[in-house]
């Protein structure tokens, strides 16, 4: 089922925004075809972290991830960062050859920074290019702000939900902003 035109969408939830001091606590992937039709959802993985690591989260992350149940899932998880990387690669290898898909998502450069430091084999699986939906969001906000009114994100800050939102948002921009 591998197709070099398929797109890999990824989202990470982290303990904060600093890849040198914060860590990945959840990850999910979705593979779409080039027309944004979902082909498969990968594993949704809560990555185990110690209570000591979780205690270093700032107020926003503590409230957000605690309220969504993610912090508890991370505590209960037995999956290490290395195992999460392995499971995700195992899934992706079924759908996209190495080096063919850009890394796809929202503000994806931030996710890529964490992958580079904490999951380098997974980061290297992607093409060097990024498909960042937030680029279109920024352009639409400046060039056609009325388009922004037609799309609302769920905002759960759970990895799989965030990817679904990103794909839906790109579909929205394709229909209302990009003239093809």
UniProtKB/Swiss-Prot annotation:
Documented EC number(s): 3.1.15.-
Active site (catalytic residues): 128
SMART domains: EXOIII
SUPFAM superfamilies: Ribonuclease H-like
Gene Ontology MF terms in the entry: 3'-5'-RNA exonuclease activity; nucleic acid binding
Family named by the database record: Belongs to the oligoribonuclease family.
GO biological process, one term: DNA metabolic process
Superkingdom per UniProt: Bacteria
Any matching Pfam family: RNase_T
A GO cellular component entry from the record: cytoplasm
Designated name of the protein: Oligoribonuclease
Record function comment: 3'-to-5' exoribonuclease specific for small oligoribonucleotides.
Keyword Plastid on entry: no
UniProt keyword Cell membrane present: no
Signal peptide span: none
InterPro entries from the UniProt entry: Exonuclease_RNaseT/DNA_pol3, Oligoribonuclease, RNaseH-like_sf, RNaseH_sf
Species name: Stutzerimonas stutzeri (strain A1501)
UniProt entry keywords in alphabetical sequence: Cytoplasm, Exonuclease, Hydrolase, Nuclease
């Amino acid at each position: 089922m591998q197709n070099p035109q398929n797109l890999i969408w990824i989202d990470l939830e982290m303990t904060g925004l600093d890849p040198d001091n914060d860590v990945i606590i959840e990850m999910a992937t979705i593979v779409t075809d080039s027309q944004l039709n979902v082909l498969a959802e990968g594993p949704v993985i809560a990555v185990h972290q110690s209570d000591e690591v979780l205690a270093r989260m700032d107020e926003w992350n503590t409230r957000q991830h605690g309220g969504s149940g993610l912090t508890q899932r991370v505590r209960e998880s037995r999956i290490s960062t290395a195992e999460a990387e392995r499971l995700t690669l195992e899934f992706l290898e079924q759908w996209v050859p190495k080096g063919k898909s850009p890394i796809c998502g929202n503000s994806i450069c931030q996710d890529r920074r964490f992958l580079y430091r904490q999951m380098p084999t997974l980061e290297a699986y992607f093409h060097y290019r990024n498909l960042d939906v937030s680029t279109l969001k920024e352009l639409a906000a400046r060039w056609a702000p009325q388009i922004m009114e037609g799309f609302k994100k769920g905002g759960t800050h759970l990895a799989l939900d965030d990817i679904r939102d990103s794909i839906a948002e790109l579909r929205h921009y394709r229909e209302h902003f990009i003239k093809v």
